Amino acid sequence: MDILIAQEKNIHQQLEAKKADLENLLTTIKEENYRREYTPSLWPTDSYDVTSSYGGRVNPFDGYSSDWHPGVDIANNYGAPVYASASGVVLQSGWYGGYGRYIKLGHDFGFTTAYGHMSSLVVSAGQYVEKGEIIGYVGSSGYSTGPHLHFEVMQYGEQVNPSQYM
């Protein structure tokens, strides 16, 4: 009888250890899902036609001077949907100089994303948006050479190459 009680106690301890392991795993999965939801990782439009990459480039307006391009330009049809690359809050929505119709989203982990040259905007400052939600439509507003989306990613206020997150 003592052997059975000892075995039962041992099995109970093993079950409690497995339960703790599963709870830790569940916590890790939830944290990873949260990180993925609020980190820019969704390509912001249906086209993958990058016409201007992040970094140094020849100025597309004069064809010879060099300039720094803080994002990627993605050619697409005028009016194609633009999606939030991660869940977050709309920090800015409206006209923003050379960016034309522009949206800036704030995300967790210090990330912000910016979307420029749109034809129309469908979200307002202060609004919460989910990853993949339509926030506007591709256009050619502002200082632009044709219909495309200008897309930027910043982390803690510093420009980063969007390609490393997509």
Feature names for model-found ranges:
Residues M1-D46:
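Non-catalytic extracellular/periplasmic "stalk"
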Residues L42-M166:
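Catalytic cores of peptidoglycan-degrading enzymes
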